[in-house]
Amino acid sequence: TVDSFVIERWIRDRDVFVATARDLGAEVNVQDAGADAQEQISQIDYFIKKHMDVIVIIARDCGALSEAVERAHSAGIRVISYDRMVNDANTDMYISFDNRMVGEIMAQSMEEAIPDGGKIFMIQGSATDNNVAMVKEGFEDTLQGSNLQVVYEANCEGWTAELAVDYVEEALEEYPDVKGIMCGNDDIASQVIQVLAENQLAGQVIVVGQDGDLAACQRIVEGTQYMTAFKSIEDLARQAARYAVKMAEEGKVSSDVTDTVNDGSYD
């Protein structure tokens, strides 16, 4: 069950995951939650009724799915958190990137692009998403001791990129001399750049994002976005598919998975 296919990268994840799983002999049922947490809960319950072996979740709201995951576990179904950790749910596996490193790379790019320093905004993703906290940590730790100052922060709840419009407009009123904007992903960056363009600031304010979306790469060529942290989505999706199929076949987490991460209540 996928948060939404509005974000380009989830389409790429889906295509690679489905192709890999089918090559391994698995049947795959993909559901689009349409950016609706309640719909995603309904989809998980549907999968439970269909007696799926494994449910892979790209969470809409990382804090809203723990009871649904508990129902899946009670039915003997394994659950994987894919790139967004389901909080307080004790999912069987969490597979993602090194999100702290993503934040570090974004900060390093900012320092490179703004050598004279100045004010920057952080327009991040959902506050309930553990990845957002990790990216923020890496970003802020890297900026410590630099001449860049974070003067405005906001979170786009539910990863709703359109919320960035009001945030940036508000921030620009107070800090019109902003030098850079860190965006939670390229979808958010697209909204931020739209506001900058309306204020004749596109290309003058450094904008960084992540995901390597095609549109972001085009904006980099145009000069309105400075960088996007590229992540090998294909590798992540293939690996997740292999683990999901193996989990379905063996009924347990693969023995080569040894690292743990805390989801708020469980390791």
Put a short name on every predicted segment.
Residues 15-30, 145-147:
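Signal peptide-proximal N-terminal region
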Residues 48, 110-115, 172, 240, ...:
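Short, hydrophobic alpha-helical segments
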Residues 62-101, 105, 112, 119, ...:
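Flexible loop/hinge segments that line or gate small-molecule binding clefts
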Residues 45-49, 54-73, 139, 152, ...:
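Hydrophobic alpha-helical
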Residues 185-193, 221, 231-251:
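Extracellular/periplasmic ligand-binding modules, especially the Venus flytrap/periplasmic-binding
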Residues 28, 76-79, 150:
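Hydrophobic beta-strand scaffold residues
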Residues 1-15, 29-39, 60-61, 84, ...:
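Hinge/beta->alpha junction and helix N-cap segments in small-molecule ligand-binding domains
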Residues 127, 131, 141-143, 239-267:
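Hinge/cleft segment of the Venus flytrap/periplasmic-binding protein
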